[in-house]
Amino acid sequence: PPAYTGKPTLYLSDQPPGSLAVPVGARVTLRLYGRVGALEITESYSDTQPDEPSPTRAFKIDGDGFIQIGADRWEIAATADMAPRIQPAGELTRTLDGEMRLPFAASDDYGVTAGSAEIVLNLPRVERRHGLVIDPEPREAIVVDLPMPYRGDRAEIEELLVENLAEHPWAELPVALTFTAIDAAGQQGQSAPVEITLPGRRFLHPLARAIIEQRRDILWSQDNAPRTARLLRAISNRPEGLFPGDGQYLALRAAISSLERSELGTVERDDVSKVLWDLAIEIEDGALAVALEELRRARERLAEAMRQGATPEELQQLMDEYREAMRNYM
């Protein structure tokens, strides 16, 4: 059989005469022992038959036909290699940090050898507002390899695509995802496009969320740089109490200055986007840490007051502080 089938060699002497299914592309080698010409060989695959009897003959199975050796005849049913099939096998799930999980199922008559997922921007579904009004810069499709079983039968597989594309410019935008499966013969099968919103990281702090939105706009198009600089400058106009640390305010002002340069290029724009991403992460995680510490302190104060026999009024005040800290943390 062809190598793509992964099947062992088949011996004709072990097969009873009659119908015989053989993969297209299989090579047949006949070797006869004894007196040459004692058994007549006829088959439908060679363009010409030998003029003289020969103890060997070789040919390729390219379709239905027959092989006859003496009185024994095999009717060959050539089985074509089918293209692999692949499709989603469940709903997309996501985590707060932007990790996406999408199950898929693939199958092939001789086994799936590889696969990929291609993600493209679904521009007609994008809500064209604010920085997304202008046309986006062209970007190549996202292509990620699919996980495959290390061992065992790959004729039927179910796996899970796990990927984190939270930093990609298309995060939180409509995209179309297409699965592709490949078999050993190089044939490909594709799923219908799956329309999803590409998961991004959830930013809960208002300042971090505003910075990420402006980062998205400059990655959508470099022409958004002047507008983004103006908005970031307005956001940071009164930094008192807005930034958890002075270093964050200075980092944002440096990013604004870079965006306002007339010679801003793609490399510089991408550098600024990295600064904005890191800044938003620092603000988000820092605010969470502060809220958690305030919640811990409020809980400890309440517990200590109960141990010391505080009055109902004092306990009520501390309970209100604890609830407020819990709301801030949540």
Protein language model annotation of sequence segments:
Residues 1-330:
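Extracytoplasmic/secretory ectodomains and luminal regions
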